């Protein structure tokens, strides 16, 4: 396996970064709550998750995957939550 951020990063590295960004936004907590109680995932978090997934799939179409795939300029801004 290639180290994160190293030249030649693979699909697993891109998905790891996507999951990290989703977790930082609290998506995991809302997703579990949705599964357990049926409560809807907040719209801004659901939209953010859709954007992150789109970016991850798009990065995977670039050959080779950019060395700086973890940089914020590729990814959507995290929603502001109170």
What are the functions of these language-model segments?
Residues 1-82:
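A preference for well-ordered globular domain cores
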């Amino acid at each position: 396996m290639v180290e994160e951020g190293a030249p030649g990063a693979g699909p697993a590295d891109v998905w790891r970064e996507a999951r990290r960004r989703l977790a930082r936004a609290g998506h995991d907590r809302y997703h579990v709550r949705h599964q357990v109680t049926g409560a809807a995932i907040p719209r801004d978090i659901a939209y953010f998750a859709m954007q992150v997934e789109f970016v991850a799939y798009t990065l995977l179409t670039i050959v080779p995957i950019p060395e700086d795939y973890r940089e914020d300029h590729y990814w959507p801004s995290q929603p502001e939550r109170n």
